[in-house]
């Protein structure tokens, strides 16, 4: 796949095949039996799905050499976030609705977040 250095496409495809086999080995349970029996089968199926998911993550980490989850985006402190609607209220179609406005000054209306 484009953009990766040191990884061959064959290894990645092999990893994907292994993961596909794992998921295919755990089909959804059949809707037969009493309510309690169906519930127990679904509970066991979900537990197996969680295990398969964890094993799949380990396989991908091994083949790709990096975690599968993206790096978390750092947000500014809540004290610096404000809603600024003085310029263009009501014209949300022109600009992105809810675009963040960051103000340096602190507003007393927000408070410090500490209960007295």
Curated annotation (Swiss-Prot):
Entry keyword Phosphoprotein: yes
Listed GO CC annotations: host cell cytoplasm; host cell nucleolus
Annotated stretches, region: Homomultimerization: 18-26
Basic residues composition-biased segments: 36-48
Keywords attached to this entry: AIDS, Host cytoplasm, Host nucleus, Host-virus interaction, Methylation, mRNA transport, Phosphoprotein, RNA-binding, Transport
UniProt entry tagged with the keyword Transmembrane: no
Renumbered ranges of motif Nuclear localization signal and RNA-binding (RRE): 34-50
Phosphoserine PTM sites in chain numbering: 5, 8, 99
Disordered, as annotated region: 26-48, 90-116
Posttranslational mods: Asymmetrically arginine dimethylated at one site by host PRMT6. Methylation impairs the RNA-binding activity and export of viral RNA from the nucleus to the cytoplasm. Phosphorylated by protein kinase CK2. Presence of, and maybe binding to the N-terminus of the regulatory beta subunit of CK2 is necessary for CK2-mediated Rev's phosphorylation.
Note: HIV-1 lineages are divided in three main groups, M (for Major), O (for Outlier), and N (for New, or Non-M, Non-O). The vast majority of strains found worldwide belong to the group M. Group O seems to be endemic to and largely confined to Cameroon and neighboring countries in West Central Africa, where these viruses represent a small minority of HIV-1 strains. The group N is represented by a limited number of isolates from Cameroonian persons. The group M is further subdivided in 9 clades or subtypes (A to D, F to H, J and K).
Domain notes: The RNA-binding motif binds to the RRE, a 240 bp stem-and-loop structure present in incompletely spliced viral pre-mRNAs. This region also contains the NLS which mediates nuclear localization via KPNB1 binding and, when the N-terminal sequence is present, nucleolar targeting. These overlapping functions prevent Rev bound to RRE from undesirable return to the nucleus. When Rev binds the RRE, the NLS becomes masked while the NES remains accessible. The leucine-rich NES mediates binding to human XPO1.
Quaternary structure annotation from Swiss-Prot or TrEMBL: Homomultimer; when bound to the RRE. Multimeric assembly is essential for activity and may involve XPO1. Binds to human KPNB1, XPO1, TNPO1, RANBP5 and IPO7. Interacts with the viral Integrase. Interacts with human KHDRBS1. Interacts with human NAP1; this interaction decreases Rev multimerization and stimulates its activity. Interacts with human DEAD-box helicases DDX3 and DDX24; these interactions may serve for viral RNA export to the cytoplasm and packaging, respectively.
Protein family according to the UniProt entry: Belongs to the HIV-1 REV protein family.
The protein's name: Protein Rev
Source species: Human immunodeficiency virus type 1 group M subtype F2 (isolate MP255) (HIV-1)
